[in-house]
Every structure is written in structure tokens, then in C-alpha cells.
UniProtKB/Swiss-Prot annotation:
May play a role in fatty acid biosynthesis. It holds the Pfam family HpcH_HpaI. The keyword Repeat does not apply. The keyword Metal-binding applies. InterPro entries: Aldolase/citrate-lyase_domain, Citrate_lyase_beta/mcl1/mcl2, Pyrv/PenolPyrv_kinase-like_dom, Pyrv_kinase-like_dom_sf. Mg(2+) binds at E129, D155. Belongs to the HpcH/HpaI aldolase family. Citrate lyase beta subunit-like subfamily. It comes from Deinococcus radiodurans (strain ATCC 13939 / DSM 20539 / JCM 16871 / CCUG 27074 / LMG 4051 / NBRC 15346 / NCIMB 9279 / VKM B-1422 / R1). Its EC number is 4.1.-.-. This is Citrate lyase subunit beta-like protein. One of its GO terms (molecular function) is magnesium ion binding.
Length: 284
């Protein structure tokens, strides 16, 4: 298996029927890429069937050409007529499989079992994109094979019969619930797609909100979004330097027998130290 890094700040998608675009995925230096057999491929049996060998071969070539890159395939939803045939595209060399529109923990367990039966012990990136999926987010993420989850705002809003607005108030509750469930289960949460492709300020504002809600990375649908995602997700070198200095100060205080100490004008407590340790753990 091509193991993904501990932190996925950016996950860049490409259509599974476009080998030319898949080959270009590493150019923008995302942390992970997804070869998409679901939304990016027309919803006909003929189109899905034609995309599978393209996606399979493109994934193989991408893994060989960019061994540092985490490569995923997104299959169609479990209860779609395409799901089982999509499994033929998967190989053990992938970093994981993206399963959209999961709605119950039992569905995630069923997917994991089907993968195991095919000798494909791949971790799952679970898509929570419906009212039921958000409602049952925690039980889905408690399935051991689920390592990451993403919130899909567009499908969620459609499922509820709502409407997307520039401010995103209509998805704030669900977006927060997915982030909370991820925190409680130790799963990494990936934030929503920004469909405005030529509007970096809109992307930045959305990424800033996602980071504030607790998301650790962002789904990207254009190469230009990758660098923007990296601005907001994951520690900067300044963040790392400050964390190291804080832990050094804590060690020095402990040597002096001081349980409490201040750092840069702030009293330090254990949650601050834990946050610094977590930040530096992503360097591994």
C-alpha cells in the first residue's frame, strides 16, 4: 500500500476517464489525489464501464511515477448499480478508497468486508453527503477501517432540498457536526469543495472557516486550489518553531522543578503542550 502522510492538507480530484488530467495531478504538489469514478464521470453504464480501465491504468502509472503521492480512487456509492464493478479498479498499492454518500455505520462495515473478501485491506475515506450521513457521522467514523471523512456540502444541500448561499450558513451545522464527530473518533476531517474556480479570495475565506471549525484539510477540484489549501491547513514553519520552543521551555521548567511557567506572556497549561506535541507529530 502507498501509505498516505499523517496529515492530508489537500486532496485533489481528477475525472477517472481522463488519463491526461490524472497524469498531471502531481504538478501542483497536493498531499493526496483522487481518481474519481463517481461525480466526474457521466452517470451511464457505458460511461462508467469505459472509465474503469482508464482509471485502473492511470492509478498504476501515477503510483509508479510519483511514489511519494497518496493515491485514492473514488468509487460510486454502495447502493448504486456501479459499486461492485468499480471495485475491480482497486489494487493493494492504493493509499485508500473514497466511498461517497455513506449513511450508516453498517454500510461502512459492509464496504470494509467486501474489500477484505477481495484481499484489498484499504483504509476508507468516507463521504458524508446526506442528512442521514451527517446524522450518523460518529457511528460511520467509529468503523475501524474509516481513516478519513469528508463533508459534501453540495449533495447535502440537495438532499435536504435547500439552497447553497455564498455565506454557507445553510451547511454550518452539518459542517460542524462532521468536524466534531471526527474529533471524537480520531478520524481526519476533510473540508468542503469550493466550486468557484477563479476566485482565490472565496477559497481563502472558506478554508479559513473550515480550519476554524477543526478540519485538517480540504478537497480541491482545481490545481490552483492546492497551494491555497496549504496556506490554511497544516502547520507553517513558524508554527513548528514556536511549538518546539514551547516544548523546550516546558522541559527547562520541569528540570527546575517548576510545574507552572509562562511562555511569550501566556501561562502554559497541559492542553497547550498537547497541541504543540500534536503539531510536531505531523512532521513524521
Amino acid at each position: 500500500m502507498n501509505a498516505p502522510p499523517a496529515l492530508l492538507r489537500s486532496v485533489l480530484f481528477a475525472p477517472g476517464n481522463r488519463a491526461d488530467l490524472i497524469a498531471k495531478l502531481p504538478r501542483s504538489a497536493p498531499d493526496a489525489v483522487v481518481i474519481d469514478l463517481e461525480d466526474a464521470v457521466p452517470g451511464t453504464a457505458e460511461a462508467k464501464a469505459a472509465a474503469r480501465p482508464v482509471a485502473h491504468d492511470a492509478a498504476r502509472d501515477l503510483i509508479a511515477a510519483a511514489p511519494h503521492l497518496a493515491v485514492f480512487v473514488r468509487v460510486n456509492a454502495l447502493h448504486s448499480p456501479y459499486f461492485e464493478d468499480d471495485l475491480s479498479v482497486l489494487t493493494p498499492e492504493l493509499s485508500g478508497v473514497v466511498v461517497p454518500k455513506l449513511e450508516m455505520g453498517a454500510e461502512a462495515r459492509q464496504v470494509a468486508q467486501m474489500l477484505q473478501e477481495r484481499s484489498l485491506p484499504l483504509p476508507i475515506l468516507a463521504g458524508l453527503e446526506t442528512g442521514a450521513g451527517v446524522w450518523n457521522a460518529r457511528e460511520i467514523m467509529e468503523v475501524p477501517e474509516v481513516a478519513w471523512a469528508y463533508f459534501g456540502a453540495e449533495d447535502y444541500t440537495t438532499d435536504l432540498g435547500g439552497k447553497r448561499t455564498p455565506g454557507g450558513l445553510e451547511v454550518l451545522y452539518a459542517r460542524s457536526q462532521v468536524a466534531l464527530a471526527a474529533r471524537l473518533t480520531g478520524v481526519a476531517a476533510l473540508d468542503i469543495v469550493v466550486t468557484a474556480l477563479n476566485d482565490p479570495e472565496t477559497f481563502r475565506a472558506d478554508a479559513e472557516q473550515g480550519r476554524a471549525l477543526g478540519y485538517s484539510g480540504k478537497l480541491c477540484i482545481h490545481p490552483a486550489q492546492v497551494a491555497l489549501a496549504h496556506e490554511y491547513f497544516g502547520p507553517t514553519e513558524a508554527d513548528r518553531a514556536r511549538a518546539r520552543a514551547l516544548l523546550d521551555a516546558a522541559a527547562a521548567a520541569a528540570q527546575r522543578g517548576h510545574g507552572a511557567f509562562s511562555f511569550e506572556g501566556q501561562m502554559v497549561d497541559e492542553p497547550m503542550l498537547a497541541k504543540a506535541r500534536t503539531l510536531l507529530s505531523h512532521e513524521a
